[in-house]
Swiss-Prot record:
Disulfide bonding pattern of the chain: 45-78, 121-324
Keyword Coiled coil: no
Official protein name in the record: 12S seed storage globulin 2
Residue ranges, compositional bias (Polar residues): 495-518
Provenance organism: Avena sativa
Length: 518
């Protein structure tokens, strides 16, 4: 009997280890912070002279604008990144599409909904409903005459959200607010997930675009009408329509009557309810259906799965539990999420694979910095990633130095501008009088920096005699060099401020330097 069970035990142990290894690879656990899943930049890249970038050109759609940065520039190609900025007008729908490279999206302003469609995951939003323009069905009428729809999870997005976009995953976005959604997209085209050429490619499921020299169409337009209709089980007339041959609206279209899909909303009693599809209408009407931060079942890190009229008798497998229920977005702007905070200098918030596990799928991370008037950031270098810095608000003096001690960038970075900071290059940033806010996209899910000054810095870690002999200074001067910043780290208070200078402090934040708790 034992002889019979032993081979079976070995077999199941092997299967468990195989599946566990596959999941670890899927979520990036096989990489340490010192490793990278990237292919590396172009050989011969020197980054001798950096520059601030603004969008090179715009492409207009029916309900929005797409701004493209110059991905052919050597700095973009050497860093292996591609950047675009989208403006989606109210009632604008970004049509379903996917990309050949993983990326991160930061919502600069606006609010709306987005959906990410993962293959093999269940459609957890399901509802049978009756068309709005028909009377109630008579009692006993067949339920099969009711319309039925089901789709995967829909995410509410707002200003300050970071959305993770894995390569090859279909996504869409709808603006249900009364102000445009402005979003910046950063793609890591050198990631191993991209096995095409190292440039960002959009694959449209609907609509068309004008990015290339020739008019780009959606993926269905390349198939013959007959084969397409047979494969999808539709008429040839419908097949011609989904090819969008004569559709001039672009990839952002206007939905005049509001978009209809199943979404959670909050009743006055508190629990999440779900009804037939309801069109997204005005902001006042929407606020009675769904209010951010008031739903106990629709918050960051949780998944909302409900299927009216159906019970799940099968158990979820590991893929569904760990992959399909991942949170697609996290808000990086909330002061309560700050990792470090100095009431006289500013705050810094990090998103990495530890507090945002979905970043393991895109192998990227993000850092948002809010510097107050004349505050300065500790000089540092990125240990394991390139950095794409996008100025959100205000201005900052930025200086970057290469391995030869040469200044490769020394200028004021302004709102809307972008700067690529290469790995290991040393950077120093100081806010102007109005302060500054920026976000940095890193090409590693657990990006690390080495600070030069402050409590956790390299200088603090070196012996006094090493500093004194290295710089030919006295021991007292070396001691001052180590400790002049006291207990400060990351964001520093300006040392030589004018009398009466304004003290910036966010409402609800502490009055002393502290390490913010999650």
């Amino acid at each position: 009997m034992a002889t019979t069970r032993f081979p079976s035990l070995l077999f199941y142990s092997y299967i468990f280890l195989l599946c566990n290894g596959s999941m670890a690879q899927l979520f990036g656990q096989s990489f340490t912070p010192w490793q990278s899943s990237r292919q590396g930049g172009l050989r011969g890249c020197r980054f001798d002279r950096l520059q601030a970038f603004e969008p090179l050109r715009q492409v207009r759609s029916q309900a929005g604008i797409i701004e493209y940065f110059d991905e052919q520039n050597e700095q973009f190609r050497c860093a292996g990144v591609s950047v675009i900025r989208r403006v989606i007008e109210p009632q604008g729908l970004l049509l379903p599409q996917y990309h050949n490279a993983p990326g991160l999206v930061y919502i600069l302003q606006g609010r709306g909904f987005t959906g990410l469609t993962f293959p093999g995951c269940p459609a957890t939003f399901q509802q049978q409903f009756q068309p709005f323009d028909q009377a109630q069905f008579a009692e006993g009428q067949s339920q099969s005459q009711n319309l039925k729809d089901e789709h995967q999870r829909v995410h509410h997005i707002k200003q300050g959200d970071v959305v993770a976009l894995p390569a090859g995953i279909v996504h869409w976005c709808y603006n249900d607010g009364d102000a445009p959604i402005v979003a910046v997209y950063v793609f890591d085209v050198n990631n191993n997930a991209n096995q095409l050429e190292p440039r960002q490619k959009e694959f449209l499921l609907a609509g068309n675009n004008k990015r290339e020299q020739q008019f780009g169409q959606n993926i269905f337009s390349g198939f013959s009408v007959q084969l397409l209709s047979e494969a999808l089980g539709i008429s040839q007339q419908v097949a011609q329509k989904i090819q969008s041959q004569n559709d001039q609206r672009g990839e952002i279209i206007r939905v005049s009557q509001g978009l209809q899909f199943l979404k959670p909303f909050v009743s006055q009693q508190g629990p999440v309810e779900h009804q037939a599809y309801q069109p997204i209408q005005s902001q006042e009407e929407q606020s009675t259906q769904y209010q951010v931060g008031q739903s106990p079942q629709y918050q960051e890190g949780q998944s909302t799965q409900y299927q009216p009229g159906q019970s799940w008798d099968q158990s979820f497998n590991g893929l569904e539990e760990n992959f399909c229920s991942l949170e697609a977005r996290q808000n990086i702007e909330n002061p309560k999420r700050a990792d470090t905070y100095n009431p006289r200098a500013g705050r810094i918030t990090h998103l990495n694979s530890k507090n945002f596990p979905t970043l393991n799928l895109v192998q990227m991370s993000a850092t948002r910095v809010n510097l107050y008037q004349n505050a300065i950031l500790s000089p540092y270098w990125n240990i394991n990633a390139h950095s794409v810095m996008h100025m959100i608000q205000g201005r900052a003096r930025v200086q970057v130095v290469n391995n030869h001690g040469q200044t490769v960038f020394n200028d004021i970075l302004r709102r809307g501008q972008l700067l690529i900071i290469p790995q290991h290059y040393v950077v120093l940033k100081k806010a102007e009088r109005e302060g500054c806010q920026y976000i940095s996209f890193k090409t590693n899910p657990n990006s690390m920096v080495s600070q030069i000054a402050g409590k956790t810095s390299i200088l603090r870690a070196l012996p006094v005699d090493v500093l004194a002999n290295a710089y030919r200074i006295s021991r007292q001067e070396a001691q001052n060099l180590k400790n002049n910043r006291g207990e400060e780290f990351d964001a520093f208070t300006p040392k030589f401020t004018q009398t009466g200078s304004q003290s910036y402090q966010d409402e609800g934040e502490s009055s002393s330097t502290e390490k913010a708790s999650e």
